Amino acid sequence: MDKEHLKKNLQEKMEKALKVLDHELKGLRTGRASVNLLDSVTVEAYGSKMPLSQVASLSTPDARTINVQVWDKSMVSSVEKGITIANLGLTPATDGQLIRLPIPALTEERRTELVKLAHKYGEDTKISLRNIRRDGNEALKKLAKDNVIAKDEHHSLSEQVQKLTDDYSNKVDSVIKQKEQEIMTV
């Protein structure tokens, strides 16, 4: 593995960690209706568990409602059950094949819990960034030990890896801060 490949590999891994954080944060309720809230919902369908999006179409007609249009009439009760089991704090209101999910306003207490959860996701992401940095530094040490790179080049590359880690750590902080503002906005 050469140094350019190593840097590119580290950057790709850090980018993936940031994408995972984005995905986790989309699942946090902010008081506004978003079909992303239902990403974690699975439904017992045709003898197996399926994501809700594969048995129904999801839409947000307004800021406080999510509509779930179930395609197969026989699946309505299974979809309701899946939404309830997901423990999202949403109460399904069924009208034929249409399930309406009114989004209740978030209490101050719940907002604080969500902010703490967002910070936990951010910290988990920073831990994975540090692990990626550690792996990169170990690879650099191996390159230096095998005389593929000189000692001063090793030092320079280590600094670049640290700068990359710091940049992504700052991105995590900014994403978390933005999500915190979104959650706390009434």
From Swiss-Prot:
Which residue ranges run through the membrane? Answer: none
Pfam short name (any one): RRF
Q: Which GO terms describe its molecular function?
A: ribosomal large subunit binding
Domain of life from the UniProt record? Bacteria
The record's InterPro entries line, in alphabetical order, gives: Ribosome_recyc_fac (IPR002661), Ribosome_recyc_fac_dom (IPR023584), RRF_sf (IPR036191)
Report any one BP term from Gene Ontology: cytoplasmic translational termination
Gene3D superfamilies in alphabetical order: 3.30.1360.40, Ribosome-recycling factor
Offer a single GO CC term for the protein. cytosol
Quote the SUPFAM superfamilies the UniProt record gives.
Ribosome recycling factor, RRF
Which key words tag this protein in UniProt?
Answer: Cytoplasm, Protein biosynthesis
- Cell location: Cytoplasm
Keyword field contains Iron: no
The record describes the protein's role as: Responsible for the release of ribosomes from messenger RNA at the termination of protein biosynthesis. May increase the efficiency of translation by recycling ribosomes from one round of translation to another.
Xref: HAMAP family: RRF
UniProt lists the family membership as follows: Belongs to the RRF family.
Please report the name of this protein according to its UniProt entry: Ribosome-recycling factor
Source organism? Rickettsia africae (strain ESF-5)
